[in-house]
């Protein structure tokens, strides 16, 4: 029988593989949920199908302005408000298929935002294992406040 460390590595490898399917430029995030009954559900960050595959909008800065004319430079990308995070996508799949997330473990390539952390807590997730830490760690705080085990993967 596999050890917990071996299982963690296997499921994190799956989350990493799923992240490669994301069409995001700024962030490619994959998530895998393993229920207490061994059901595996996956998700990636993306848009609802009718909205296409462009997850980001370009951001611009005015570098000079002469009268009515302005010279702009593209200075980055910002995720669209309609992007569905990987954790939310897998929860949507669970809801559609009638899969319970009570006492499940979620493996994600990027630690949760506050919103996703709240959703995971609401459906009864027991444990979250993440690969990289998101720049804002409030999601980790929410998980801990909800008595969910949180681990940084060190496989």
Predicted regions and their residues:
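Zinc-dependent deaminase catalytic domain
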Residues: 1-155
């Amino acid at each position: 029988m596999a050890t917990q460390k071996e299982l963690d590595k296997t499921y994190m490898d799956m989350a990493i593989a799923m992240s490669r399917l994301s069409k995001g430029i700024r962030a490619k995030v994959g998530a895998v949920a393993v229920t207490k009954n061994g059901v595996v559900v996956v998700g990636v960050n993306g848009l609802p199908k009718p909205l296409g595959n462009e997850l980001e909008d370009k951001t611009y800065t005015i570098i000079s302005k002469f009268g009515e004319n302005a010279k702009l430079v593209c200075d980055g990308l910002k995720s669209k408000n309609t992007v569905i995070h990987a954790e939310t996508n897998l929860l949507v799949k669970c809801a559609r298929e009638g899969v319970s997330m009570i006492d499940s473990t979620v493996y994600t390539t990027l630690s949760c935002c506050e919103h996703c952390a709240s959703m995971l807590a609401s459906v009864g997730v027991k444990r979250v294992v993440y690969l990289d830490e998101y720049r804002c760690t409030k999601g980790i705080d929410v998980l801990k406040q909800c008595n969910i085990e949180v681990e940084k993967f060190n496989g």
